[in-house]
Amino acid sequence: MKITRFKILLSGSLGVLLTFLFLDSPAQTVTLQHVTIFQEKISLGSGEIAAAEMLSEEVGKRTGAKWPVSVTWPASGDVIVLKKASAKTKLPFSISVAPELAKKSESYRILNVQHQNQKVIIIEGVDDRGVLFGTGYLLRTMQYKENSVGLDQLPSMASSPDKYMRGHQLGYRNTANSWDAWTKQEFEQYVRDLVVFGTNSIESIPIFDESVSPHFKVKPDEMNAFISKVCQKYSLDYWMWIPAQFDLKDTALRNKYLGTFEEICKQSVRINGVFFPGGDPGDNPPELVIPLLQDLAAILKKYHPKASTWVSLQGFTPAQSQYVYKYIQDKMPVWLGGLITGPSSPTVEETRAVLPAKYKLRHYPDLTHSVRCEFEIPWWDPSFSLTLGREAINPRPDHYSAIYHALDPYIDGFISYSDGVHDDVNKIIWTALAWDRKADIRNILQEYSNYFFASSVTEEAADGILALEKNWQGPIVSNGSIATTLTAWKALEKANPSLDNNWRWQMNLLRAYYDAYTRGRYIYETQLQRQVNEKFLEAASIGADAAMKEANNILAKAETQRVMTEIRTHIIDLCEALYKSVSLQTSVKKYQASGLERGSVLDFLDRPLNNRWWLEDEFKKIQSLPEKDKVKALEVIANWEKVGPGSYYDEVGNVGKSVHEMKGEDWRMDPILRKNFNPGYDFSDDGLSRKRLSWLTYMRWPIAMEYGNIDTSARYTVKVNGMGECLLKINGQRVAPSRYGRGYGEIKEFPVPQALVQQGKLVLTWDAIDEDFLNWRKQSRVTEVWLIKEQ
C-alpha cells in the first residue's frame, strides 16, 4: 500500500474546509481551526516575541485569518506553540524527545501532536533565534488561501544552520536604488522578509560621504538608529560598514571620524560587528589603518562590550596584504574579530590559509551587480550589458548557488553587498544555502514563490525565475527561450491580477518583458544595419551623399517604426509601478536614480543596438572628403566584418561573434571565472558612448584565437583592433607588426611568417603587459581580430 500524504488545513473562523486526495488513499485531511499561537511569558527573548508577532501578522496578510497570541492554553481550537527548549512551558501533554534538538545556536525542531480534539504544532528552539527561524520555516512552507492555510503534513523534524553568519548589507544612502525612499515600516518589513528565510545579520552604512538623497523620508542618523532597534527586536546581529574616505594622516579628519563613530555607538541600541574596508572606498595603507582600527575597537567596546571589529583587504597591494597577515600572526590582536574577503581582495583560499584559526573569515559577496563586479555574468551578450547594465533585476539562482558552493569550504559566514531590492532572489539563495548547503535551488524558489506570491503559482513562478537566468546565457539572437520565458510570465500575469501590485512579481515581469524587447530590437536593428551596409555599396552609382541620406532614413526606423510597441509600453508601465510599490528607481531623469549605472534600465530602453550613433558621427567626418574618398570610406564601413573566402572576423568578447576565440572552463566548473576570463564591457560616457559597438566589448587579452585547416600555400595577415599595446604570438612565436595603431579603429597588422602558415593551424596568443599603474579604463585591450587570406 502506498504511503498516504496528508494535507493540514489551518482555517480561520470563516474558513472553508477542503479535502485533498493523494495517491490511492481515501480523502483525508487534518484540519486546524480557530488557531491560537501559544507562548508563555517565561524568559522570552526578543526573537521569540517577534516570532509570534510575525506569524500572526504574516498569516493575516495572506489569508485574512486572525491568529491571536495567548499566554494561556485555549479551551478549543488548534494551537501553534512557540517555545525555547529551556523554558518550563506548561503544556497539557508530554512531547517527544525525538527528533533531538541540536545544541547549536539557532537550532530548532518542529513537532506535531494530537491533544484531545486539538491539533498542535510545536516549534521549539534551542534559543530565541531558533524559535524565530523555526517560525520562518513554517511561514514559507504553509500554503495560503483566503481564511485558511494548508500545510503538507510535517514529520517530526529538526534543523541547524551550517553557517553562524548569514546577512545582508542594507545601506540607507543615495547610492541605493530603492530603500533610500523607504519609511521605517517598509524597512522593517524587508528585514522581516529576510528573517523568514534565515537571515540573522543586517549591516548598515552610518558613515559615508553621501548624506543627502532626494528620496529620504527619514534622516540617515535616525534611520540607522532605527535599523539597530529592528535588529534588537528580531534578535539579529547589527553590523556597520564604516569606510574612511580621507587621508588618515589628517589628524583633524581622523578625530572627526572617531567622534562621529562614538556618537553612532551611543545612539545604537545594538552593535555586534564593525566592518572597516581596506579600500573600495578608501586609499590608506595598513600601517595607518591598523592604528585606526585599534582606536575604533576601544570606542566600540566602551558602549558594546561584545561587539568585534573586522577589516577587509580590499584594494591592498599583495605586499600590504602580507603586512596585515604578519601583523595578525605576530600580535594576535584581541580586538580583531576576523578578516573579510570580497571584491578586489585576496582570494578566500589565500586568506583562510594564513589567518590563525581563532579568527573568523567572513565573505562580502557582491550579489547586486551583473557586470564590472566580483561575480560577473559569464559571457553576457553585449545587447544586455548595453541596456540592462550593471544593476538590473538579476535573479541568478544557479550561478550564485555554484559560487556559494565554491566558497563554502573557506568561509565562516557572509554578509552580502547589496544596493537595492533588485537582487532579492540572490539574497534568499545565499541565505538558504548558508543555513543548509544541501538545499535544492528549485525548492528554495518554490518557497520564495509560495511565500511572496501565492501558493497557487509556486511551481510556475519558481520555474519562471529559473528561466529568467537562462535568458542571459549565450547569444541573444539564438536564445529562443527568451520568447518562451515571456510567454510563461505573460500567462502568469494574466491569471493572477491580484499580484499586480506585488513588487517582487513586478520585477520578474519587467525582466521577462525587457529581455524579450531587447532581443526583438537587436534582431530588427541588425537587419537595419545590413540594409545600410548594402546602401553604402551603392555609393559609387548613386553618390555618397545620397547613400548616407538613405542610410540615415533606414537607421531612423528604429525610432520611427519601432517593433514590439505594446511590450515597450508595458515596460514603461512596470517601471512606474515599481517606483510606486517599492521605490525602485529605474531612471535618473524620471525617478531620480543616483546614476545611470545604478539600475537605470529605463534610460537605456531604446539605446541603439546597432552602430547608428557611430555612423552618424562618421557621416560628419566623411562629408568633407572628396567624392572618391567618400565612396571608399563607406565601402570600408560596409565591409568591416565582411571577409573573403578563407578569411575570418571575430568580435572579441562578444559571445555571438567570436567563434574562433577560445573560452575557458564553463561557469559550472569555474563559477568564480578564474580560468574563464570574462569580457570587459565599456561604460564610458555613462553608458552612452557613441563608439562602434564592437569597441565596447573587449578582452584584456584573449586566451587564444584558433584557426584550423589553413591553406598552407597562401599568405595571411592578422589584423587587430583595440587600444594600447599588443604583444602577439602566433603558434608560440612573437611576431612583428607592419602597422601599429594604438587607438580604436587604428588597426595593427601582423604578417604571418610563412613557416607558421605551413603548420596548417594558427593559434594566436598574447603576452601579458603589466599596466597596473594605469587606470583600467586606459589599459590595453583587444576588441576585434581578423585573419586575412591574401587573394
Task: Enumerate the predicted regions with their spans.
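Acidic, contiguous N-terminal accessory segments
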Residues: 3, 7-10, 15-116, 151
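Short, solvent-exposed loop/turn elements at domain surfaces
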Residues: 45-47, 89-92, 131-132, 175-179, ...
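Feature activates predominantly on carbohydrate-active enzymes
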Residues: 51-54, 58-60, 100-252, 266-270, ...
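Catalytic-core regions of glycoside hydrolase
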Residues: 67-68, 145-147, 200, 212-228, ...
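C-terminal non-catalytic alpha-helical accessory regions
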Residues: 418-426, 438-644
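Glycan-recognition and processing domains
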Residues: 629-713, 772-791
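Beta-strand-rich ligand-recognition modules
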Residues: 694-713, 721-790
